[in-house]
Design a protein with these regions (language model features):
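Conserved N-terminal phosphate-binding loop of PLP-dependent enzymes in the Aspartate aminotransferase
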Residues: 1-338
């Protein structure tokens, strides 16, 4: 049987069995539903999009997958080049993986090893946010702060190497004053904390984080697995405040295939580019850079560019603001719109 996510299988309701999907709609044998969650915020172009379908079909006729260990291929190379040209600053170096959680793990390994490669082994700490969610693997559980997901493993997910603070500039300044010489990175879901409760905060917090990271030589990591590709009204929050490492996932392939990217700037990359073998990043998911996933991602990005998605997002925002004004039911505590 299928072991379903985030469910007590003994008491869960029978899930809807989907037999078809098209556009915003999911179909069971006798029902048509709007997928308002976009399969956990990933299906940004709708289901069964002909452009992405064709990109995958064209690639599968050549090959579906070869590892990137000792081999390479055009779809992975083109996607890394596209992301480098699309992203701000010198975020040019793409490490691919097969899920957002793993991509955040890679970012945390990069940040820690960056300093270890320099001989600075005291920088073992991560500064993260209260109510953060960065994934379900053990290190991302440590960096996260959401008991709704990891309450049973709370004792094992806690770490002396992670400090959580509220999204307040005074708390940020105090944390740097106390820990700055032990921090390797500040890890945030920028502007919007998704799974932790759709909590929003001001970009001024990120600008201060960038300033303090520069002042004290700490890396700034943006987890834009959920917030990327227009979710905040910007293509990426990285367009507003430039991180040292950016993590992308979910919508990267238009929701077609699990794939993610950990994108580093030149400074971070050069911390690994060395004659010393031990300074290499020792991480390698089997399906990193999967050719079908990369082809889907390239088609998805092309759609995002050619169909003026940022204007579409502005129109959706305007409609949402207008319609949400009528939400006055006493059971509704707060309406949040970005």
């Amino acid at each position: 049987m299928i072991w379903y996510p985030y469910e007590q299988l003994k008491t869960m309701k029978a899930p809807y069995e989907i037999v078809d999907a098209n556009g915003v709609y999911l179909y069971t044998k006798d029902q048509k539903m709007i997928d308002s969650v976009s399969s956990w915020w990933s299906v940004i172009h709708g289901y069964k999009h002909p452009v992405i379908n064709q990109a995958i079909i064209s690639q599968v006729e050549k090959f579906s997958h070869v590892m990137l260990g000792g081999l390479t291929h055009e779809p992975a190379r083109k996607l890394s080049e596209k992301l480098a040209s699309w992203l701000p600053g010198d975020l040019d170096y793409c490490f691919f993986s097969d899920s957002g959680s793993v991509a955040v793990e890679v970012a945390l390994k990069m940040a820690l090893q960056y300093y270890m490669n320099r001989g600075d082994e005291k920088r073992t700490m991560i500064l993260a946010l209260e109510h953060a969610y960065h994934g379900d693997t053990f290190k991302t559980m440590e960096a996260g702060d959401d008991e709704d997901y990891h309450f049973v493993l709370k004792a094992y997910g806690a770490s002396p190497y992670v400090v959580h603070i509220p999204t307040e500039i005074t708390a940020l300044e105090e944390a740097f004053e106390k820990y700055h010489d032990r921090l390797n990175c500040v890890l945030v879901e920028p502007i919007l904390q998704g799974a932790g409760g759709m909590r929003m905060y001001d970009v001024s917090f990120l600008k201060k984080a960038r300033e303090l990271c520069d002042q004290y030589g700490v890396l700034l990591v943006f987890d834009e697995v959920a917030t990327g590709f227009g979710r905040t009204g910007n293509r990426f929050v990285a367009d507003l405040v430039l991180p040292d490492i950016l993590v992308l996932g979910k919508a990267l392939t238009g929701g077609y295939i699990g794939h993610a990217a950990t994108v580093a700037n030149r400074k971070v990359f050069e911390g690994f580019y060395d004659d010393v073998p031990e300074h290499a990043l020792m991480h390698g998911p089997t399906f990193m850079g999967n050719a079908l996933a990369c082809s889907a991602a390239l088609a998805s990005i092309e759609l995002f560019e050619t169909q003026n998605y940022m204007e579409k997002i502005k129109r959706i925002e305007a409609v949402t603001r207008r319609e949400m004004k009528g939400f006055t039911d006493p059971r509704i505590r707060e309406v949040r719109i970005m």
